[in-house]
């Protein structure tokens, strides 16, 4: 690209105009408009550091620190790519001696980011610039944008309560920019560091658990869990046509149940710092959901529902004796992929049948074939948290979307999964100190690792279609869906997740801590009639009805043998708030009565 091309390039010219409009919208606090304009800039110039930095600030003001962190991190990646590209090369784009390496994706990204940054500098200049002048201006521009990105990233992680990661980027800022006077007044890494330490000490005083394991707990924060205002992929799940379509699918899995639109209580989002029961600030009202109802009696021990899912993952498919597609036990005869198989009888991707291999290759395997994801599996298996499997569900969703060239949120396996409700958008939203953010947030799991997984599949995350497909809000929407509906099977010996899966129809069953059905996880999920009085049994009992005709079928999203407070903690993630089933309300009243009795005794 030479000087003439830069000055005439329609995308660059449009991008420049949009940036000015977006900045004006941001200044007047028209935040959704500003976000839309910055996103449009990225569709014209997808390697634009400035657009990522400013959209990051916009997300932070909108009350989405998680999305702000994602944009700021991508801006830093572009800045690093530019620096690497500039090493040992002439600066003016299009120079004949410029070294080009088409096989180096990192260099290609740096080249595109360099051209975009150089072009904006050139468009702002009234005359052609010499190389030394360009070098000086580029350094000033890149340094300024990187400093802003680092500071916004640290602030965003602080707001999301990922304090350890926030400190990491504050330290990076202090190292890169030791002279604070050379930075804009609003960028102060030392002041931000001091504030983070103060918040950490405050949290330790509020919750003693943070004193015991601060390095882990201070990396896990939270963020808003909602349908983003710009998310146009979420279907109207309560439309009569949608419900009819889902019931047609349900008929393939069970003839004894049907999906209906129901009203469920709005869940309480507040709690005290120690996770104890609050007796005030209750919420009331109801909201629409889907539920599953019995069309005829279902008996204890009767398996009445079966559903397969291609979104089934193994914690270590290369060393498992389970089918990578359906999670069934492998027999003596199994199928492999020659491109993945290394000749070691103890490793490699394996399927239990020709049919499973065919399905895998048609749906997702080409994007994963012969790729090295060992680092992902090692990280997953190092954790005992069942949420670690969500990274693997993301990976398979990405692979399916890439293979089928379909937006991740439009995949049939994902589209109708319940993750969040569409709530009214409040531009002046600020999270309450008592409000537990309903979507857990971890910077590694939800920002850096997904980017690394996409890069392993040769996805340039800055390409226009990648911005739309794999922007962080898409990842967060998927994460919310997986937290809400994913099932998992834990290995009896290690206590770690062995299998996880998401099933569309399974997700339609609502939760109760006093369920009338129970399930078994695998590539195929089975529902069986259940009663806490009878306990778990595989024997069909014709004499005991678990669910009467016309009643709602209630599954369970947590271990129902736990006590009230532990169940509330475990169910919070899937439900997005306090469980308010009949059992919990009854036990909550008992806890409240005990508390009032204790207070009465102390007052005497």
Question: How would you describe each model-predicted region?
Answer:
Residues 1-604:
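Short alpha-helical interaction motifs and adjacent low-complexity tails used for partner binding
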